[in-house]
From Swiss-Prot:
Catalyzed reactions per annotation: reduced [plastocyanin] + hnu + oxidized [2Fe-2S]-[ferredoxin] = oxidized [plastocyanin] + reduced [2Fe-2S]-[ferredoxin]
Record-linked Pfam families: PsaA_PsaB
Ligand binding (phylloquinone): W692
The organism of origin for this protein: Coffea arabica (Arabian coffee)
Residues given in the record as chlorophyll a' binding sites: H675
Binding-site list for [4Fe-4S] cluster: C573, C582
Name under which the protein is recorded: Photosystem I P700 chlorophyll a apoprotein A1
Annotated function: PsaA and PsaB bind P700, the primary electron donor of photosystem I (PSI), as well as the electron acceptors A0, A1 and FX. PSI is a plastocyanin-ferredoxin oxidoreductase, converting photonic excitation into a charge separation, which transfers an electron from the donor P700 chlorophyll pair to the spectroscopically characterized acceptors A0, A1, FX, FA and FB in turn. Oxidized P700 is reduced on the lumenal side of the thylakoid membrane by plastocyanin.
Bilayer topology term: Multi-pass membrane protein
Record localization: Plastid, Chloroplast thylakoid membrane
Length: 750
């Protein structure tokens, strides 16, 4: 008798050839919807086509099919990202002054775009130094390339080609995993396995390989660059990787190889894995040895985290158990049922991810200037301002997106019959208390924060400076913020005994880092002016949250419309005969939330731009005297509304308004054009649908008279469509106006 070990059961996780590849179907607009596929009767058709093309919920109710479409779309997204990156690297290789910038980053500006002379627009090619004429870029790519050890344009070409290959690969993967081997629903819902791969694979091994690259390639190359060695003389990356003696000349402990690691004598590696804090005085960036150490530590943490969850072997945590154990004395059933929500509603899952990623993006914005990670980034003021502004906007949009998808989850995926007394149910049951308290907080913050400014404007207008809230009259010092600053400034040698400097120069301590006569960073003083504007931040953020949270908590029902869930995520009003029920859909809350998000982020980036020009950025003389760009006027000017208008908006707009005839003139045109786009939005936002329908009908009459009427009937935009077009142009116009204003200013004076 032969005893066989039991055959392992192989779980089949994919379906083969589930959907045939049909070019005929792809070529047919609206193939995903019976109604839209019929073709246009009226012009509303094109709007519905765009609104529903990616609303996979509306194509089918089969969760597996929806999951596959989302998964496939992700590969398409990655393909576009690789294509974009490839373009950036190609521009660096083909059209840029990267090699010149590398040899003298303090006197030469980064440029990767040279305008062709067609109608005289070669005026835009400004002199960026070193005899190169082009458009100055503010994306920070040059600084990243230097930090990663790229020393010539051939390397950029190779990376660009590599990214193109990856883009093609991603496109193929998107097709393959929808049409050839599509994962089953069980695969999408296997969260423990997903966590293992994402934590240990993406974040763990990703960080480890980046740390390895930094140690073996970036550090030695940057060491040579910092010492002033000509980039052409520096050995190439593969020489450092293959030849240990080369590295040992720079870092002697390399000669010992892995012995110190296995004998636990890790301090030997302290040459290239440091814990210094502060900035490298040569480049004004974080110490690259600190960054390598950081990525190694992060890699270890995530590799451990990736092994915490129970998959094929019966050990480790189960997500469902963790969530169901999560309850306290006041939280009823706690998170019971949350596991089922997050594995069956991708909107709920996406909502959490957007909220966290949005918050993280805003954290990134604040770290990019306070702990500038790349060499010569801190002294490139245009790039610093651009990176801060960009990450703030992106974070704001992601957080509004979180509320949007939370509301879609509530309308489409929430099942009240199966939820009782878990945390979500308890939040919904006392939503009135939450919203009314939040509303009170908004009113309090609004009146008090704005009231402080109005007081100051009034006192200033009446010529009574001694009665103003300011650092020289009635002081309102931000004592808690100053306490946090001091705690961090004193950390080295106290709470962080191993560090030689604090995490950021902004905390205080008197250090100043200047590179090539320009200030990289110095301690940022906070005073009454910051106290005032921070309360405006609190106000705008709370109002944004009020609108978005109300939209989520009242997405399914309200006293006004008890059956709101039946009307869907977006609807204009609750039908005829019910006046006063317009603008109550969850979609309308997202619409309104976007405007307040725009308010909130605008105040933040204005605060940052002016504060940095006034108190941080500037030049330093040989005697060590710092001259700031706006001479420290923030503390006294920004404490009145009039000061913001006069000394920030008007005074700093002079560069963009006077840019005609110079290399910055494109910003002047954009400033004008984007104002126009913004104003155009008001035509959609302050208009009634009937007005346009009447107008359209008389225009159609004229076309009929001339026998040129189209077969597709023109229709005025629906209320929701009009609002969507309006808010899009409002945000686009506002953001582009700000962009032109900031860049013309900072490129001219920075």
């Amino acid at each position: 008798m032969i005893i066989r070990s039991p055959e392992p059961e192989v779980k089949i996780l994919v379906d083969r050839d589930p959907v045939k590849t049909s070019f005929e179907e792809w070529a047919k607009p609206g193939h995903f919807s019976r109604t839209i596929a019929k073709g246009p009767d009226t012009t509303t058709w094109i709007w519905n086509l765009h609104a529903d093309a990616h609303d996979f919920d509306s194509h089918t109710s089969d969760l597996e099919e929806i999951s596959r479409k989302v998964f496939s779309a992700h590969f398409g997204q990655l393909s576009i990202i690789f294509l974009w990156l490839s373009g950036m690297y190609f521009h660096g290789a083909r059209f840029s002054n990267y090699e010149a910038w590398l040899s003298d980053p303090t006197h030469i500006g980064p440029s990767a775009q040279v305008v062709w002379p067609i109608v005289g627009q070669e005026i835009l090619n400004g002199d960026v130094g070193g005899g190169f004429r082009g458009i100055q870029i503010t994306s920070g790519f040059f600084q990243i390339w230097r930090a990663s050890g790229i020393t010539n344009e051939l390397q950029l070409y190779c990376t660009a080609i590599g990214a193109l290959i990856f883009a093609a690969l991603m496109l193929f993967a998107g097709w393959f995993h929808y049409h050839k081997a599509a994962p089953k629903l069980a695969w999408f819902q296997d969260v423990e396995s997903m966590l293992n791969h994402h934590l240990a694979g993406l974040l763990g091994l990703g960080s480890l390989s980046w740390a390895g690259h930094q140690v073996h390639v970036s550090l030695p190359i940057n060491q040579f660059l910092n010492a002033g060695v000509d980039p052409k003389e520096i050995p190439l990356p593969h020489e450092f990787i293959l030849n240990r003696d080369l590295l040992a000349q720079l870092y002697p402990s390399f000669a010992e190889g892995a012995t110190p690691f296995f004998t636990l004598n890790w301090s030997k590696y302290a040459e290239f894995l440091t814990f210094r804090g502060g900035l490298d005085p040569v480049t004004g960036g974080l110490w690259l040895t600190d960054i390598a150490h950081h990525h190694l530590a992060i890699a270890i943490l995530f590799l451990i985290a990736g092994h915490m969850y129970r998959t094929n072997w019966g050990i480790g945590h189960g997500l469902k158990d963790i969530l169901e154990a999560h309850k306290g004395p006041f939280t009823g059933q706690g998170h019971k049922g949350l596991y089922e929500i997050l594995t069956t509603s991708w909107h709920a899952q996406l909502s959490l991810n957007l909220a966290m990623l949005g918050s993280l993006t805003i954290v990134v914005a604040h770290h990019m200037y306070s702990m500038p990670p790349y060499p010569y980034l801190a002294t490139d003021y245009g790039t610093q301002l651009s990176l801060f502004t960009h990450h703030m906007w992106i974070g704001g949009f992601l957080i509004v997106g979180a509320a949007a998808h939370a509301a879609i989850f509530m309308v489409r995926d929430y099942d009240p019959t199966t939820r009782y007394n878990d945390l979500l149910d308890r939040v919904l049951r006392h939503r009135d208390a939450i919203i009314s308290h939040l509303n009170w907080a908004c009113i309090f913050l609004g009146f008090h924060s704005f009231g402080l400014y109005i007081h100051n404007d009034t006192m200033s207008a009446l010529g009574r400076p001694q009665d103003m809230f300011s650092d020289t009259a009635i002081q309102l010092q931000p004592v808690f913020a100053q306490w946090i600053q001091n705690t961090h400034a004193l950390a080295p040698g106290a709470t962080a005994p191993g560090a030689t400097a604090s995490t950021s120069l902004t905390w205080g301590g008197g250090d100043l880092v200047a590179v090539g006569g320009k200030v990289a960073l110095l301690p940022i003083p906070l005073g009454t002016a910051d106290f005032l504007v921070h309360h405006i931040h609190a106000f705008t953020i709370h109002v944004t949250v009020l609108i978005l949270l109300k939209g989520v908590l009242f997405a399914r029902s309200s006293r006004l419309i008890p059956d709101k869930a039946n009307l869907g995520f977006r609807f204009p009003c609750d039908g005829p005969g019910r006046g006063g029920t317009c603008q109550v859909s969850a979609w309308d809350h997202v619409f309104l939330g976007l405007f307040w998000m725009y308010n909130a982020i605008s105040v933040v980036i204005f605060h940052f731009s002016w504060k940095m020009q006034s108190d941080v950025w500037g030049s330093i003389s040989d005697q060590g005297v710092v001259t700031h760009i706006t001479g420290g006027n923030f503390a006294q000017s920004s404490i009145t509304i009039n000061g913001w208008l006069r000394d920030f908006l008007w005074a700093q707009a002079s560069q963009v308004i006077q840019s005609y005839g110079s290399s910055l003139s494109a910003y002047g045109l954009f400033f004008l054009g984007a104002h126009f786009v913004w104003a155009f939005s008001l035509m959609f936002l302050f208009s009634g649908r009937g007005y346009w329908q009447e107008l359209i009908e008389s225009i159609v009459w004229a076309h009929n008279k001339l026998k040129v009427a189209p077969a597709t009937q023109p229709r005025a935009l629906s209320i929701v469509q009009g609002r969507a077009v309006g808010v899009t142009h409002y945000l686009l116009g506002g953001i582009a106006t700000t962009w032109a204003f900031f860049l013309a200013r900072i490129i001219a004076v920075g």
